[in-house]
Amino acid sequence: MAELGANLLIETLKTLEDGTLGRMPQYHDIMTYDPMLTKEMGIINWADKAVDIVNRIHGLNPWPGCSTAVEGGRLKLLRAEVAQGAGQPGEVITADPKVGLVIAAGEGAVCITQLQAPGGKPMNSKDYLRGHPMAVGTVLKEEISHD
């Protein structure tokens, strides 16, 4: 693949240099604009499908990043993958230092593989759970309620 890419780059640079590189018009009637990224876009809605949550986590990393509310602040979610499991959206269905952190989504579940605690360094979820036990059945929310 690298060799193919290198050859294509050389070919493209040659056509650019000799002026034969073809131009392609933009179709203004079908183009769309995306809004500027904001921190609010990174707040996880656990009612979304697991695959959408995982894509959001990967797509918004490193900035603005994704997070969810936990006691003590916001937990940054850095890497994740779709997992098996079911429960109420946001419900912790696995919190085992040997297995990791799995949270139910609106459809499916999300295994958080790397995260960052408030004021901490990025770490894998297994290491996080060794120092910050989480009860299975805890429901993570977009924001912490102060009842």
Q: Predicted segment positions?
A:
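Active-site-proximal loop/hinge segments within enzyme catalytic domains
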Residues: 1-83
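An anion-binding loop in the catalytic cleft
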Residues: 46-147
